[in-house]
Amino acid sequence: MARFNRKVMPHWRSGFEEEVAAFLKIHQNKVRYEKLKIEWIDLAYRKYTPDFLLDNGIIIETKGRFVASDRRKHLEIKRQHPELDIRFVFTNSNAKLYKGSKSNYEQWCNKHNFKSAHRVIPMEWLKERGKPIKDKIVYVKKRVKV
């Protein structure tokens, strides 16, 4: 019986993540997909896995829908890990936060000091100087009993 040796490609959670990965494959040394875990505290210790990690240490989160629970989670992570540079790439940055909302995803990001982009990672983000993240897990600095 013949065996086939083929490279196993990562399993993308969406077509949009696959598009971003293809873009990064061209413009980065290595595509780091879900390679980092960030510990954060809610009512318990939780771990968040961002989508992509750039060579310069910038964390990219790709989003189709940006629901209230994700927004709250990212505000908490930013509060607990101010040293991390988390940025969003939306399929539609002009989408409203919820039905009837006056603000959209991009406005929410601006209000809360997150950088965001529409569909494509800007080349400026790839060229920015930064500090690469070498750890696989970023822990909360001060652990408390929950």
Descriptions of predicted regions:
Residues 1-146:
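Nucleic-acid endo/exonuclease domains
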